[in-house]
Every structure is written in structure tokens, then in C-alpha cells.
Amino acid sequence: MVRAFKIKVPASSANIGPGYDVLGVGLSLFLELDVTIDSSQAQETNDDPNNCKLSYTKESEGYSTVPLRSDANLITRTALYVLRCNNIRNFPSGTKVHVSNPIPLGRGLGSSGAAVVAGVILGNEVAQLGFSKQRMLDYCLMIERHPDNITAAMMGGFCGSFLRDLTPQEVERREIPLAEVLPEPSGGEDTGLVPPLPPTDIGRHVKYQWNPAIKCIAIIPQFELSTADSRGVLPKAYPTQDLVFNLQRLAVLTTALTMDPPNADLIYPAMQDRVHQPYRKTLIPGLTEILSCVTPSTYPGLLGICLSGAGPTILALATENFEEISQEIINRFAKNGIKCSWKLLEPAYDGASVEQQ
């Protein structure tokens, strides 16, 4: 019997305002996997060591450089981890995965998180494991241990999340693949052993309301910035007053984004940050000027502005004048010789999905 299904996983923006490693929002830009399993086509997947033929649309981000071996690609490495945790060595015979990825790589829009979520769902579906989203989240968080992007991509909407501490024994297994956000070897080694199942409830989250009038403008510079490099510039310790600054604004922002009408006088200052953005200005030319000079008083409709994830993408929340706001930020990047594109997005309220075909 031939099986076919489509997996869709949204991009995400994390570190919203003061919510470093806490707040994330799923965005209406989707990684898509078209999957078929047909044992009569097994000869077409024999070149792959794990029975999976992987391909990408030519329009996909990273089309010319993304690895196509199932044990090297992050999506399929993740799926193999799920399978092997459940004592299944390989993909079913004749598995084909065709990927369409419009999410820019290394720009702070959750491309790695989307790949991990897609991979966990792929493993769950091909083996018909029947996991809930909450259980799949545990698998995701073993691989990418930053719950803000992962939770927003899996669950959708505007989320706050935290990750409980894991023991060294729980995270040191070589079979666990590691996403690109961590400055470590890629993991996912095939030791021939059955990896232990992930602990349950590794991450906890809540979904906040979001005023639907608020749109997300992503201004995307044409250069990549790895999360590992971006984390490398952060200090090991912070002044107490900087942590209090963020905590105060975090408490206000999660409610301010639900209010109707949106209040720029409340949201704009509540989206300020002292934990990561000041330290990343050396990696993103023009960042300080952009965050301080593009304001609601100069651009009506603008509510707030921040780095998206680790950057370099800028996330601006607004209710109108989207093109004018985008062009101003693009022009400021251009002063530093950096070209940009921009996208107008909305929250992806439902998160990741599977459609049987």
C-alpha cells in the first residue's frame, strides 16, 4: 500500500523583545515535506543507507548546499533518531521526502528549529508511532535545547516556554543529533544501539493571546549569522539591574500584545532588551541605530522592534505602514553596505501540521 502525506512547519521568531530564550512566535512561512512511502519503488531509494531518497525544490533556501544523504541532513537525521529510539533502524523501504523550504538559513527565523520539528514529525509518521505534539516536543528538545523556537514551531502562536534541567547522562548519548545552534559536533552517530527514549515533559509552555491586528515584518539581511557565533559574544554574568530591566518588560509585554487597540506607548518600551541585543551589535552593522531610531513617533503603526532570534533579521511589529517601516530599516542597513529583503507575516496559530493524502 502506498502512503502519502504532507508535513508543514512554520518559521519562528524567538527572543521577542525582553524574552531571551523564553518568548517565541510561529510565523506564516512554512517548511513543507511531501512524503511518499511505496515499497514497489524501493530500487529508487537503494542509494541511501537508510532507504530514504531526499530532494529539494530548486527555490528552496540552501538548495545547492544542503546535504541529501539521510544521515547528514538535519531533517532526516532527526527522523532517524526518533525511529531508533523506538527500535526501528531505518526508514520504510521506498521512502521519498521532497522538501520545499522558503525559510532563510542562519537569519534568525527558526530554520533549524523548523527542520528539527519536521524531522520528529517525519519519524512519528513513517513509523506510525502515534505521538502527541507534547511528546514530540520532548524529542525536539533533546536535539535543539532552546524551547522558544521549537515550541513556537510545533505548537504555533505566541508562546512562553522553559526547559527543565537534564542530567549529563540524559544528554550525552552520541546517538542524539544536535542542531546547528549548538557549537558542538553534529551528533546523531549510529552506534548500533537503541538510544534511550527522551524523558517526558522536558519543556513546559503556555500560549498567549495575540491581537490579530498586529502583523510581523521580517527585514532579512543578506548574510548569515550562526546562533553559536551569536551566543559567543554574550557575557557569562549580568548586572542585576539589567536582568530586572528585562523581567519588568517581559511581565508587561505578554499582556500588552493582547490588548485592543494595540498601544505603541506600552509595547515599544516593553520590547526593549539589555540581555542580548547590546552585545550582538558588533555582529550586525547598524543594529544600534535601527533599534533606537525607528520609532512609533516617526512611523505611525509601528508598535515595537527587536532582533529576531539571534539575528541578523529584524522583527518589527506593526498595524500599518508596513512597506514604509521596512524600507526605512532596509535603507539603514544599506548605509553599511548590507542588502535586505522583507516579508510581511502573521502568527501561525496552529503550528506544525500533517495532512494525509
From Swiss-Prot:
> Location of the Glycyl lysine isopeptide (Lys-Gly) (interchain with G-Cter in ubiquitin) covalent cross-link?
K133
- Function summary: Commits homoserine to the threonine biosynthesis pathway by catalyzing its O-phosphorylation.
HAMAP family the record matches:
Homoser_kinase
Name a GO molecular-function annotation: ATP binding
Q: In which family does this protein belong, per the annotation?
A: Belongs to the GHMP kinase family. Homoserine kinase subfamily.
In Swiss-Prot or TrEMBL terms, this protein is called Homoserine kinase
Result of knocking out the encoding gene: Threonine auxotrophy. Leads to accumulation of toxic levels of homoserine. Sensitive to thermal stress, cold stress, high pH, sodium chloride, lithium chloride, UV, caffeine, 5-fluorocytosine, and compounds that increase flux through the threonine biosynthetic pathway (including tacrolimus, amitrole and sulfometuron methyl). Decreases survival time in an in vivo model of infection. Double knockout with FPR1 is lethal.
The UniProt keywords, alphabetically, are: Amino-acid biosynthesis, ATP-binding, Isopeptide bond, Kinase, Nucleotide-binding, Threonine biosynthesis, Transferase, Ubl conjugation
Which reaction(s) does its UniProt entry say it catalyses? L-homoserine + ATP = O-phospho-L-homoserine + ADP + H(+)
Q: Name one GO biological process term.
A: homoserine metabolic process
Q: Report the domain of life of the source organism.
A: Eukaryota
Q: Which NCBIfam families match?
A: thrB
What does the annotation say about its assembly with partners? Homodimer.
Question: What is the species of this protein?
Answer: Saccharomyces cerevisiae (strain ATCC 204508 / S288c) (Baker's yeast)
EC number, as in UniProt: 2.7.1.39
Entry keyword Transcription: no
**Additional note from the record:** Present with 92600 molecules/cell in log phase SD medium.
Pathway as given in its UniProt record: Amino-acid biosynthesis; L-threonine biosynthesis; L-threonine from L-aspartate: step 4/5
Q: Name one Pfam family in it.
A: GHMP_kinases_N
